[in-house]
Amino acid sequence: HNGVDLICESGLYIKSRTHGMVTKIGYPYDPADEKKGHLRYVEVSFDGNRFRYFYLDPMVQVGDKIVAGDVIGCSQDLTEIYTGITQHFHFEWIGPDGEFVDPTSMFDLL
């Protein structure tokens, strides 16, 4: 499990932690999957780094320039798919070398 899951309510506006450009809007699962195919992610890239925000309805398009703090989407409801799951979005940081970086340094965590 690369990245970090951050607890949130469904429908919460998710803001970019960095500036950059939207380089991908993708599906973490096969879009034909009746159960999970609607789940999406947004990738924001800056200086060779890629930041991925999973399980949100995108409010941006590929090519959009992003400033840190811009809303990029709304969190999707995972409880409809996984009974008993804690509602969350998933955040990943992939460094310029293609390796995953621990993203917790980007958040004020206690």
What annotation goes with each model-predicted range?
Residues 13-25, 60-77:
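Short, well-structured beta-strand-loop connectors
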Residues 16-59, 81-90:
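Zn2+-dependent peptidoglycan hydrolase active-site motif and core
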